[in-house]
Amino acid sequence: MGLGMWLRTGVLMAFLTGLLMAIGYVLGNETGMMFAFMFALVMNFFSYWYSDKIVLTWYRARILEEDEAPELYEIVRGLAQEAGIPTPKIAIVPTETPNAFATGRNPKNAVVAVTQGLLRILNRDELEGVIAHELSHIKNRDVLIQTLAAVMAGAIMMVARWAGWMLWLGGFGGRDRDRDASGALGAILLIVLAPIAAMLIQMAISRAREYLADETGAKISGKPWALARALEKIEHAVSMRPIKNGNPATAHMFIINPFRGVSFAELFSTHPPTQKRIERLRKIAENMGIAF
């Protein structure tokens, strides 16, 4: 992992640790902040080593053996060779909402996850376009920071909600009446600000990485038009059937935001507008001398 990726990962972990410590301070002054710091250290450790497994578990994704999906493995292996990276494992997500994401801490430990719905609505060319996009995230070393952000943001949202309820119920002892009187306000701030912080973390991952993955993926597959058609199909399907049981903290990991129109997450755009992505793919095709 290069110096730039180490720096980005370190900044992300430091920011998330600081946010957890701030929550701890609101709840229990210096003692609460110290407990939050210890919790953050544990979370950072487990997030680095196990975040990919955590994300796959959230979506009940199952690793496929090659004999279960030989054609899919053939596509992934060929594109991975073209990209110059090891062939990642493939996971299937049991939902009819078409989408895909990549996870893992490095190219040697990567997984490309696709939904049942994606395999159902895309033809082979379009599927190659999507797979190439996800392999680009692996090649460009985006997957580690994307996965860390998803797990840590999810943890922050969970802790803040739990802390908010405890403040409402007066579950933290040892505080004076002034602190108790401020409990309701603290709970409101935690409940409101935690989802905002989680969405800001996703935005900080940089929407530019999606443009880069589109461009790199188009060059890997040699079919920018196929990726454009796939994006149109996925966008339409997600607008009709968004994922309802997933974790909004993972929105930035998917090729298209799967939570469109179903939650507070819609206020924060984790992806560039699909139409702009298609227009950029059109220009890429022209530069490659390929009909669009």
UniProtKB/Swiss-Prot annotation:
Cell compartments where the protein resides: Cell membrane
Topology class, membrane: Multi-pass membrane protein
GO molecular function annotations of the record: metalloendopeptidase activity; zinc ion binding
The entry's keywords: Cell membrane, Hydrolase, Membrane, Metal-binding, Metalloprotease, Protease, Transmembrane, Transmembrane helix, Zinc
Keyword Cytoplasm: no
Cofactor: Zn(2+)
Pfam families registered for this protein in UniProt: Peptidase_M48
Domain of life: Archaea
TM stretches of this protein: 9-29, 31-51, 148-168, 185-205
Active site: 134
GO terms under biological process: proteolysis
Cofactor note: Binds 1 zinc ion per subunit.
Classification via PANTHER family: PROTEASE HTPX (PTHR43221), PROTEASE HTPX HOMOLOG (PTHR43221:SF2)
HAMAP family noted in UniProt: Pept_M48_protease_HtpX
Protein name: Protease HtpX homolog
Gene source species: Thermococcus sibiricus (strain DSM 12597 / MM 739)
Gene for this chain: htpX
